Every structure is written in C-alpha cells, then in structure tokens.
Amino acid sequence: MLDREGFRPNVGIILLNARNEVFWGKRLREHSWQFPQGGIKYGETPMQAMYRELHEETGLHPEHVKIIGRTRDWLRYEVPDKFIKREVRGHYRGQKQIWFLLRMVGRDCDICLRATDHPEFDAWRWNEYWVPLDAVIEFKRDVYQLALTELSRFLRRPAQRAEKPRGPRVSRYPRVIGAQAQTLTIVDTSVVCSEIEVEASTLDEMPPHVIVGK
C-alpha cells in the first residue's frame, strides 16, 4: 500500500527502559542495528500497527509498555534503488513513518525475538538515548535523528538510585567483536532476568545483550 508519492505507511518504535536507555535490535544475519518498525496494513490505525509490530519483533504485549509520545506527523526516508525490488522500481520510493515512544513496564525477560516464525532480529541490547547512529544503515539515519529529537521532549529524568559502596569488581569476562575486546560485568546471575552492565561508548562497540538461540 503506497501513497500517491510512492511512500509506504509505516510505524517506528523507540522503546525505553526505566533508565531512559533505548532498545536496539540487530538485523538478522547482518551487522546493522535498528529500532523495531513495520508497515501499516490496510484498515489498521498507526497504534494498532505499532502494537502488532512490537509483538512480532520483540515479543512484548500492550501490557508490557506504556505509550508516552508520538510524532506529530509523518517522517519520510527514501530507499536507494539497489535495495528496491526491480518490479516496484519507479513506483516505490521509501517509507513514511509515525514514530511512537514507549516506556517498558515489563521485565527484560519478557522480550522474545522469536515470537513469530520470521524474526527480524537475532540480538538486542539497551543503549543510551543519544548514542551515535553509525551502526544504522545510512539512508535511515536522518529520520532516526528526527524521531529521537522530536520525542526527546517526553523524556523524564530516570529515578536516582542510592549510592552503594564500591567494592572490587568481579566476574569480568572479555568479549571480542572483530578485533576489539569488550568487557562485561555480570551484576546478578542468580535470577532469570539478569542485569548486565556493559562498558562501551558507541553503538558499534556494544556487544549484544541477548543472542537468539543462546
């Protein structure tokens, strides 16, 4: 379903945790990372499409999230010809998106990348809201920046946690991605939803939080 200008109606999702960190999914068998997104089917409202895509790509249900904002209007990006199927070239130009900002009220272990038979992601992680977008495919970066900027007005300051005495750090394991080693600090491995703190400053540097099948 395309509009008169050749853009497909679509929804994008920026999912936050309690610390205002953002969910990123690694595209299946690729090295690029992105937010959940998907087309709006005929007869669907943007909100209905958002909840469907949220479940298909992250396994989350409406009760796991709270809507805290959305973009006022459509945001558009054009897709380069090399990514467009030959039979629709000349008709299809790209996507026009309504973006939703969600707050996750469930737990990390509620996320399931295999909620459907056709998963979009094979890994996921939390990262800072304003992380550099180098690992996002190039033609989507501008619209990501626009969505993040417009929706940032809905952000609230994360709850302050009481300072705990700093003891020696334990259970550190090197992880190598490409030629670069990363360090994970396992905070609590005794619960199903274990928390992992990762020392990294950019999206590309961060190792996956969860890998499908492991």
UniProtKB/Swiss-Prot annotation:
Cofactor dependence: a divalent metal cation
Top EC class, one word: hydrolase
Keywords from the named record: Hydrolase
tRNA processing found in the keyword field: no
Top-rank taxon, per record: Bacteria
Pfam families (alphabetical): NUDIX
Chain location of the short sequence motif Nudix box per the record: 38-59
Domain Nudix hydrolase: 6-149
InterPro entries: Nudix_hydrolase (IPR020476), NUDIX_hydrolase-like_dom_sf (IPR015797), NUDIX_hydrolase_CS (IPR020084), NUDIX_hydrolase_dom (IPR000086), RppH (IPR022927)
EC number: 3.6.1.-
CDD domains documented for this protein: NUDIX_Ap4A_hydrolase_plant_like
GO molecular function, one term: pyrophosphatase activity
Its biological purpose: Accelerates the degradation of transcripts by removing pyrophosphate from the 5'-end of triphosphorylated RNA, leading to a more labile monophosphorylated state that can stimulate subsequent ribonuclease cleavage.
Similarity annotation: Belongs to the Nudix hydrolase family. RppH subfamily.
PANTHER family attached to this UniProt entry: ADP-RIBOSE PYROPHOSPHATASE (PTHR43736), DIHYDRONEOPTERIN TRIPHOSPHATE DIPHOSPHATASE (PTHR43736:SF1)
Annotated HAMAP family: Nudix_RppH
Protein name per the record: RNA pyrophosphohydrolase
Organism: Burkholderia cenocepacia (strain HI2424)
Lineage: Bacteria, Pseudomonadati, Pseudomonadota, Betaproteobacteria, Burkholderiales
Name of the encoding gene: rppH
